[in-house]
Amino acid sequence: MTQQITVIGGGLAGCEAAWQAAKRGVKVRLFEMKPNCYSEAHHLPGLSELVCSNSLRGDSLENAVGLLKEELRRLESLFMEGAEATKVPAGGALAVDRDLFSQYITSRIESHPLIEVVREEVTRIPEEGIVVLASGPLTAGLLAQEIGRLAGSYLYFYDAIAPIVAADSIDYGKAFRASRYGKGDGDDYVNCPMDEEQYQAFVREILAAEKVEPKSFEKVVHFEGCMPIEEMASRGPETLRFGPMKPVGLVDPRVGVEPHAVIQLRQENLEATMYNLVGFQTKLTWPEQKRIFRMIPGLENAQFLRLGSMHRNTFINAPELLMATCQLKSDQRIFFAGQITGVEGYVESASSGFAVGVNAARLSKGEGLVVPPAETAIGALARHITNTEAAHFQPMNVNYGLFPPLPGRIKKKEKRGLLAQRGLEALEMWLPELS
């Protein structure tokens, strides 16, 4: 006897989770608060509304999001079915007609005999049965309080994201390894030194740079612990040098003295393929970030795997709270899916919903749960949000820095293609587990 699944949230993750569970013969009640109640960012009455952009980003396997989309195609994702049915010309990217996309997904969901769409706001999490929480990045009110009851201090309402660069794009001829005062293993950080002239030019460019204007639903809330670098720079020319760029305790071994200023890069993952710019959360536009941060000695040719941002975003500390299957450790009948888990982006949200929908159905039927291989884009993203360092967890787009490294020395221009090939091969080997 299968248990009915309750899905809270009719966005990309919730719809994908509901669809995958129903495809596997399980009844689903999908709760969506629209059109009775709208968030500040939503305007369409339908399901799976794309709020900010109609672009689903590049289709090439040279980009990890392209691989993620190809995996979802092969897995017969409703999200990708809808995207292909409503796509518009966009060069090498995949973009959709937002209204038609929402209408398509809504029609498919509402016409499925095993899915009941309930148009009402959820204010309490059911105390029995299997539940998928996919309420999205603007979760607020009583439902946010309910999630807070489960998550405790590990529920956040704003993100403060620093850029991440690929380790193999750092120029170690200019950067040096060291920890402040030799603490830890002594070389835990990669340090990019600046002299006084470089520092002053860097600060000038930050102050003059174009910034992202906050959305109407985003109140500007800056906490001292995660102040944007441009805000710090506006407080005085030396503020950054006494904040995230302070050089004290860091001696450049090539000259034997402390630099005028230092940008520290901290290892982001166990494989040491990604490093983040410590304390460099920012609201500079992405083109300005690339231009200005490539002024940093050692990062002139940096490959940015994630760019900085600060915005309204309800999410949990997934590594602290969730199992590898995105079940709540403290109550395994509850799954989390979508951006509330810390995945960032449309495709990533659908991917999260796919994996959770499959496992919610399997739990309902008393079957063993499955985890996608880490070599796949779906698996690499899932592993990141549930198995990264909880203390520094922030939302993340899919990127090749999340994947297990390839064995041996690989030419840089060949690496992405080989990672994509390995990912698709791993996916094909995983498919029998899903049947």
Curated annotation (Swiss-Prot):
This is Methylenetetrahydrofolate--tRNA-(uracil-5-)-methyltransferase TrmFO. The keyword NADP applies. Its main location: cytoplasm. It is found in: Cytoplasm. It is an enzyme of class 2 (transferase). Belongs to the MnmG family. TrmFO subfamily. Keywords: Cytoplasm, FAD, Flavoprotein, Methyltransferase, NAD, NADP, Transferase, tRNA processing. Pfam families: GIDA (PF01134). Catalyzes the folate-dependent formation of 5-methyl-uridine at position 54 (M-5-U54) in all tRNAs. Its EC number is 2.1.1.74. It catalyses: uridine(54) in tRNA + (6R)-5,10-methylene-5,6,7,8-tetrahydrofolate + NADH + H(+) = 5-methyluridine(54) in tRNA + (6S)-5,6,7,8-tetrahydrofolate + NAD(+); uridine(54) in tRNA + (6R)-5,10-methylene-5,6,7,8-tetrahydrofolate + NADPH + H(+) = 5-methyluridine(54) in tRNA + (6S)-5,6,7,8-tetrahydrofolate + NADP(+). InterPro entries: FAD/NAD-bd_sf, MnmG-rel, MnmG_N, TrmFO. FAD binds at residues 9-14. GO terms for cellular component: cytosol. One of its GO terms (biological process) is tRNA wobble uridine modification. GO terms for molecular function: flavin adenine dinucleotide binding; tRNA (uracil(54)-C5)-methyltransferase activity, 5,10-methylenetetrahydrofolate-dependent. Its cofactor is FAD.
